[in-house]
Structure formats: C-alpha cells, structure tokens
Amino acid sequence: MKNIIYCILLLFSFNSYALETINIEHGKADPTPIAVNNFEADSASDNTVGHEIVKVISNDLKLCGLFHPISSASFIEEKTGIGYKPLFAAWRQINASLLVNGAVKKLENGKLKISFILWDTLLEKQLGGEVLELPENLWRRAAHKIADKIYEKITGDTGYFDSKIIYVAESGPDLKKVKRIALMDYDGANNRYITDGKSLVLTPRFSGSADKIFYVSYATKRRTLVYEKDLKTGKESIVGDFAGISFAPRFAPDGRKAVMSIAKNGSTHIYEIDLATKRLHKLTDGFGINTSPSYSPDGRRIVFNSDRNGVPQLYIMNSDGSNVQRISFGGGSYMAPSWSPRGDYIAFTKIIRGSEGKTFNIGVMKPYPQDDENSERVIASGYLVESPCWSPNGRVIMFAKGWPSNGKSSGKNRIYAIDLTGHNEREIKTPGDASDPEWSNLLN
C-alpha cells in the first residue's frame, strides 16, 4: 500500500538470534512466553491507540498457537518505550522469553509513527525492530504487520496476520437464507458486506493481489452470472453468463486467466478463461463431473476432482489440460481441492459414508503421493466441514463448519481455522452464519 512507509531501523538486525526457531510443521509446539509491553505514547489519544495495538499484537500471537502472551498484570518493570535497555531479569522473573517494546506518536502530517523492538530476554539481545508511518485509521494493519515480523523472526516463515477473508454471510431462517458476500480481517474484525443480499451468491474468490474478487450470482433461475469486483473502487463487471457453472472461477497466479467448471450436455468440465478476451478453453474431456479446479502456485498445473472412475477423486493436470494423473486412492469421495501457496500440500474435503451416515473431513496430501505412501492426513472432522482454503504462508487452513438443526435451535454454520499439523482448531468470529471462506495473500 503506497501510503504506508517502511523505515527499517538499521541498528536492529534480523540476521541473528539465540532462541531456537519454532518448527511449525511437525507436531504441537509448546507456546513461547512473550511479553508485549505497553507502547510509549506522547498523548492520551496516542496512549489509547497504543493499548489497542498491543491487544491486537497479543491476540495475533495467541491465536496462532505458537506464543503465550503474558498478562500485563504480571509485569514488574514499569518503564516503556524503545529508547532504553530493558531490565531483563525482571522479564525473566515472569518467564518471558521474548519482550516487545514499542512507541506510538502522531506526526504533524496526521499520520501515526509506530515503532517496536523485539528482545531476547535470555541472551539480552535485540532480535529486530521496525518503524511504520501510516494513516491513523490503519493502526490495526500496523499491529498485524508487527505480529507478522515477530512470527517470521521466531519461526523462519512469513506471517499471515495482515490479510483478509472473503466469505458468504448468511442470515435468516434455514429455508429463507439471505446470503451476502462479506469481507473482514483474518481475525474477524472490520466486517463489511460487499453485496446487498437481493440475489443468491456463492463461492467468492480472491485475485492474487487481493484487490479483486470473483463470485457467482444466481440473478434468476435461468441466469448464472459471474461477477468481478474491484474492492478498492467498488467497480463491478460481469465476466460472463455461464449456465451450468457451480463455483466461481479461481484466478491464475498471474491474474490474466482463471479456471472454472461448467456443466453442459450431462457432463461437467474444466474451462480456462482469458480475462481480457473472455475466450473459453476446455481443458477436460470424456463423460463425468470434473469440478473444483485450483492452480498450483506457479500456474503450471491444476488440481481438480472428477468422478470419471465412479467415485470423486483428485487429479492433477498441466494447465493446458495434458498429462492427467490421479493422486488420491483412499476410500470415500474427495472434493474441493485447494493447492497450498507453498506448493507442498493440497487440502481437500473427504466424505466417508458409513452405517451411521456421512462423515465430513478436511485433509491434506502431497501433490505426488506416489513419492510418499503416508502423504494423506485428516486434520479436522465433523457433521459438515468443507471449503478448505490456505493462509498466505501455507501453514494454516480455514474451512466452513456446520451443525444440524434440532428441536430447540436451527442449524448453524461458522468459519474455523486449524494448523497444518491438525492442532489449534479455533473459530473465526463472524456476526452470524458464514460459509465459503477464501483467504487473501498478504496485503501490500
């Protein structure tokens, strides 16, 4: 974002640190105790913003499950700010391995100047720091960016806190649901509605830059429109009127093409559309249902599900439709694959039918399981779990989770997130029912 100016503090190096890097891919790690100290402020209003920034940073670090923010009620040292050396013994006494000190100041141009330093209290060393200048109303993004820097320093991976979620917001009784496209921060804050609820909408999808989305709108019983909407300008245009489309297209990584499934003459096939010319190119052949395509991060391959062999399974093909390979071989029906932005895993929904009914599962697998016999792994299960999507760093999966109605209450749908390891499942708060989540890349 052009109105954010980054000024890296040169005397704070991110190149060396003493704490052992947290491995976020293997098993459940014990959370690292961290103290996020009150940010120093020059005025009462700056102090209020500083307190809110500390709350957001602490919440980000807590939600990811890798850090344990220590309550400020336990703090011994009362000094705040970045212009002094902390009393490390006081922080070690409350078991804080890491310390974040910061300051916030309103500049003459109306912007906020927000600074922070990350300390290793065990070796009494600075791990890094940064200064951000940005409009006052973007203080929350500054907090997310600081949390991202801390996450990156300690895990060695990029963070995911400064990102957005697009989803379908649902309201009203079960048989008369009003569905609107909604946008929110990754943690559920700043929720706003993108559509008015006058028509049924489904499967919103981000562009690679998170500035644009696709979504499907059932304008009438006979018309299924795909819209492209610019989230910055609000401008909306019709990509096409595609009878038989079931999911919104997914953008290619380069943003010039998209891929989708369309039902015609008893079969459903994968098509690629050139967004400039609106020209369609059919990628799959034969009889059956081929749907839910998702590009690999480099745009060279596409994963999709197909029932060409009787039961829906996962397949990979080149982006031109050649070299089709089946990659799932387990029992059950595989659906809604989503390729990790790192390229190392594919998430999917798996439905297993048994004597007591259907069980829904969210799983992950390697793109080429023949190289790893134990590549498939279920990480979440429930009455209804579906629509998996990935965090920008490919280490967290978000999905929709549903419960049935009963005599006392109607059914409900919510959005949940879970780590790639299968640990730390948590609800992402929304104003009401929610489905079809999609996670953006990190914001600019």
UniProtKB/Swiss-Prot annotation:
UniProtKB keywords: Cell cycle, Cell division, Periplasm, Signal
Signal peptide bounds: 1-18
GO biological process: cell division; protein import
Any Pfam family the entry gives: PD40
Cellular compartment(s): Periplasm
SUPFAM superfamilies: TolB, N-terminal domain, Tricorn protease N-terminal domain
Annotated Gene Ontology cellular component terms: periplasmic space
Superkingdom to which the source organism belongs: Bacteria
Function: Part of the Tol-Pal system, which plays a role in outer membrane invagination during cell division and is important for maintaining outer membrane integrity.
Summary of subunit composition and partner proteins: The Tol-Pal system is composed of five core proteins: the inner membrane proteins TolA, TolQ and TolR, the periplasmic protein TolB and the outer membrane protein Pal. They form a network linking the inner and outer membranes and the peptidoglycan layer.
Family that this chain belongs to: Belongs to the TolB family.
Protein's name in the database: Tol-Pal system protein TolB
Lineage, opening ranks: Bacteria, Pseudomonadati, Pseudomonadota, Alphaproteobacteria, Rickettsiales
Gene: tolB
